[in-house]
Each structure stands twice: as structure tokens, then as C-alpha cells.
From Swiss-Prot:
The active site is at 306 (thioimidate intermediate), 402 (proton acceptor). GO terms for biological process: GMP biosynthetic process; GTP biosynthetic process. The lineage of its organism: Bacteria, Pseudomonadati, Pseudomonadota, Gammaproteobacteria, Pasteurellales. This is Inosine-5'-monophosphate dehydrogenase. It catalyses: IMP + NAD(+) + H2O = XMP + NADH + H(+). Homotetramer. Its EC number is 1.1.1.205. Pfam families: CBS, IMPDH. It comes from Haemophilus influenzae (strain ATCC 51907 / DSM 11121 / KW20 / Rd).
């Protein structure tokens, strides 16, 4: 009897990388990699578009460390676009379209704006966008009468510190120091406002030199959309908000609806970087590439909170899925993203060695300070909630179209994920430091100086159950947990 078995498939715990002659020291390894042809990451890490993983705070922190976060779509269109805008505005070389105020605005109205936007400095312009002043926290701090207008208390035009477009960093910093100001306004020859530069952005850039930024010095951010009807409006809003890369996200990327959504989006936005997924075969990867995807995301059911393989009986173990997709796309230069199943830094190294250009993680970043959600105490330990986008709770909030169930009533949803909790882990930068440290050590051991070399040069051995048992801590009780090794 023929069972139509296609091949034997392997996952992370089935293989190990082989050490090789090396001239590479871990601290000299180069971790930069391509997300798409246009976007280069400084570390090969992306955060999953999940509602317990990525919103503004985590996307900002990850971009500052050199990766990119994908804002989840379990929210209204306006809210998701607003999250993207917040990341883009958090750190700018030049704030190209600063929020401005008119001179007749009252201080009470200004106070509302400050509360809403989270910053207190606004250029003051007339109806023609001519710069006439600036108002900052210093101007308003001790004013009691909130019925006064901006024009009565602002710093007037003749006292402004301005620069022309294209001024050098040194010139700007010298001006800031000379005039003891924290904001410099950028104007053209006819004194029309063109932008604003703040000292905070210079400080942030110095503190985080590895940050993943666009050509204007703004942090990069991605956002997820579904493939179902009604997502056109969401895509348009995200593009308008300045999203760097769009993720067309589905549990089954090798589906005609997803392919059609990729084709339509590519036709409308020919230069927009588009990541599409998820697939687990060479054929699926090729289909998405043919439809116009800039990068392909691989992983059907490997995630810790995912039950797709058990509920549906469908999936491909992750190392084989990555290797097949990467081999199929090798000649096209389209990167593969390994999504799911990553528990240790060694798994990141194995995913890249199998052919992935970068990895997307959920559970590794869930539970961090920056992840959405409150810290809960349970039996004396701190936890944060973590759930699959295929869990009942997430599907009821809007992710059901990812699993082709958008028309189902809440009590008729068939979940492909669970809701759980994960130990509180502290700040994201500490997690990234440990994970990238492990990856650097791997590159030293295998003699690979770059991510590209690791993708193409490193060799695997297949191991048995006894081999994985030997690899883990054994025959000893752990008395002090290591920051990069947690079992269970």
C-alpha cells in the first residue's frame, strides 16, 4: 500500500550544526541581513504580529536594537495606522511633517494636544504654512490663564533658531549649544516650515547606533493585514501612515485568496516591500514569489501556542520547511523568514543555517516589559498573558480571517491556537543581547563571518533522541537559572 509519503522531515531538535575551522571571533561576526531587497536589518530578528507581542512599545525597542516589529491587526484601521505613525515619529533625523498649531489656538486646546500627542513643542504657522513662532513647555509652564492664545506666549519669529534644508549635523548641534535650545526649525528660503530637529533624536541616535532606520533617519516598522475582503482600506491607511513593510498574513499562504491579495497589493504599490505567508513547501514559496512577495514567511504550526498541526493534521517540521523554501527561492534573491518554534538562540542559528535570512519570534518576546498586557502574579511569580492568533480570544477580536473563518459566529469558531501565560522576562534589549550573543558564538564555532555565510556554508548532522538528551542539561538540578536557558 502506497501512503504517498513525500519525504522525511526534520525540526530544530533533530539536527545540530557542525563546528568548523574558524578565524571568526564572536564579537567580530556581522549580524546584518536582508529582510527584503530594499530593507536591511542589523540583527536577524522580527517580532510576530500578535496581539500579546507587538504594539508601539515593542516595535520601537526592537527597531532601536536593529530588528523590525510587525504591528498586529486585531484593532481598528485607524488605531493600527496610529501605532505605525507613533513608531515612525518616535525618532526622526528630521521630523519632516511636524505637528503645527495656529496662532489663535488657546492654551487649553494646546494642553489637550500635548496630552494626546505626548510632546509639548509645536511650530506655530499661519494659514500659508509660513513660520511665525514656536511654542514649547517652557513658554506655557507657569501660565495660569488658559484662555490666552498661542500667539500671546509663543517664542516670536525674530527669536527663532532656524536652519536651511540640508544643514550638517555639526552645524545644527552648534546652533543648539549656542542658543541653549532643544529644537531647531528647518525652513526654506521663503521661511516656510519644512521640518523640525530635536536634540532628543540626536541623543537617541547616539545611544542606539545599531537601530534599523529608513533613509530619513526614522525607525522602521511593519504591520500585518489579512487577505480577506475589506483589507484594501487597511492597506491604504498603513501605507499613508508610512509603514516600511507590509505583512500579508495567513495561516495558509499557498491559498488563492492570499495570492490574489498579494497580486492586487503589488499592482497598486509596485515599490512597497511585501512579506507574505505562511507556507511550508517549495511550491508555496514559489507561488508567493510569483504573486509579487518581496519575502516569504515559512511556518505552518511550529509556534508554542499553535495547535494547527494537531487540529488539522497538517504541517511540515520547521527545518525542512525552511530548507525547501530557501532552496526554491535561492535564484530569485527573495529572502525566507523562519516563523515559529524558536526556543533558544541555537534555534535561531539552525533556522538561518537551513536557509532563512531572519527569524520571527513570538513567545521569546512575549512576557517582556514592552509587550502588551499587564503583569499578573501567580503563585509568587510574575507572568504576562500570551495567546495564539488562532486562539478563541484572538479570533473573536478580529484575527479569524487569518484562519479563513471570518464569517463564523463566535460560538462556531474552530480554534488553531491556545491562550496561556508566560513568565515575565524584563526588558527586550536583555533578551536580544542573549539571543544575539548565542548566534555570534555559533558563527565563531562554525567559522561564518556573516549571516550569508551561515546560510550557505554551515553543515548539519542529524541526531537521535539520545543526542538531544545529551545536548540539554542532564543529571543535575539547576539551582540558578541562566538568562538564555529556561526549560519548560
Amino acid at each position: 500500500m502506497s501512503l504517498r509519503i513525500k519525504q522525511e522531515a526534520l525540526t530544530f531538535d533533530d539536527v545540530l550544526l557542525v563546528p568548523a575551522h574558524s578565524t571568526v571571533l564572536p564579537n567580530t561576526a556581522n549580524l546584518s541581513t536582508q529582510l527584503t531587497k530594499e530593507i536591511r536589518l542589523n540583527i536577524p530578528m522580527l517580532s510576530a504580529a500578535m496581539d500579546t507581542v507587538t504594539e508601539t512599545k515593542l516595535a520601537i525597542s526592537l527597531a532601536q536594537e536593529g530588528g523590525i516589529g510587525f504591528i498586529h491587526k486585531n484593532m481598528t484601521i485607524e488605531r493600527q495606522a496610529d501605532r505605525v505613525r507613533k513608531v515612525k515619529k518616535f525618532e526622526s533625523g528630521i521630523v519632516s511633517e511636524p505637528v503645527t498649531v495656529l496662532p489663535n489656538l488657546t492654551l487649553a486646546e494646546l494642553a489637550e494636544m500635548v496630552k494626546k500627542n505626548g510632546f509639548a513643542g509645536y511650530p506655530v504657522v499661519d494659514g500659508e504654512n509660513n513660520l511665525i513662532g514656536i511654542i514649547t513647555g517652557r513658554d506655557t509652564r507657569f501660565v495660569k490663564d488658559l484662555s490666552k492664545t498661542v500667539s500671546q506666549v509663543m517664542t516670536k519669529k525674530e527669536d527663532l533658531v532656524t536652519v536651511k534644508e540640508g544643514a550638517s549635523r555639526e552645524e545644527i548641534l552648534e546652533l543648539m549649544h549656542q542658543h541653549r535650545v532643544e529644537k531647531v526649525l528647518v525652513v526654506n528660503d521663503s521661511f516656510k516650515l519644512k521640518g523640525m530637529i530635536t536634540v532628543k533624536d540626536f541623543q537617541k541616535a547616539e545611544q542606539k547606533p545599531n537601530a534599523c532606520k529608513d533613509e530619513f533617519g526614522r525607525l522602521r516598522v511593519g504591520a500585518a493585514v489579512g487577505a480577506g475582503a475589506g483589507n484594501e482600506e487597511r492597506i491604504d491607511a498603513l501605507v499613508k501612515a508610512g509603514v516600511d513593510v507590509l505583512l500579508i498574513d495567513s495561516s495558509h499562504g499557498h491559498s488563492e485568496g492570499v495570492l490574489q491579495r498579494v497580486r492586487e497589493t503589488r499592482a497598486k504599490y509596485p515599490n512597497l516591500p511585501i512579506v507574505a505567508g505562511n507556507v511550508a513547501t517549495a511550491e508555496g514559496a514559489i507561488a508567493l514569489a510569483d504573486a509579487g512577495a518581496s519575502a516569504v514567511k515559512v511556518g505552518i504550526g511550529p509556534g508554542s501556542i499553535c495547535t494547527t498541526r494537531i487540529v488539522t493534521g497538517v504541517g511540515v517540521p520547521q527545518i525542512t520547511a525552511i530548507a525547501d523554501a530557501a532552496a526554491a527561492l535561492k535564484d530569485r534573491g527573495i529572502p525566507v523568514i523562519a516563523d515559529g518554534g524558536i526556543r533558544f538562540s541555537g534555534d535561531i542559528a539552525k533556522a538561518i543555517a537551513a536557509g532563512a535570512s531572519c527569524v520571527m519570534v513570538g513567545s521569546m518576546f512575549a512576557g517582556t516589559e514592552e509587550a502588551p498586557g499587564e503583569i499578573e502574579l501567580y503563585q509568587g511569580r510574575a507572568f504576562k498573558s500570551y495567546r495564539g492568533m488562532g486562539s478563541l480570544g484572538a479570533m473573536a477580536k478580529g484575527s479569524s480571517d487569518r484562519y479563513f473563518q471570518s464569517d463564523n459566529a463566535a460560538d462556531k469558531l474552530v480554534p488553531e491556537g491556545i491562550e496561556g501565560r508566560i513568565p515575565y522576562k524584563g526588558y527586550l534589549k536583555e533578551i536580544i543581547h542573549q539571543q544575539m550573543g548565542g548566534l555570534r558564538s555559533c558563527m565563531g564555532l562554525t567559522g561564518c563571518a556573516t549571516i550569508d555565510e551561515l546560510r550557505t556554508k554551515a553543515e548539519f548532522v542529524r541526531i537521535s533522541g539520545a543526542g538531544i538528551k545529551e545536548s540539554h542539561v542532564h543529571d543535575v538540578a539547576i539551582t540558578k537559572e541562566a538568562p538564555n536557558y529556561r526549560m519548560g
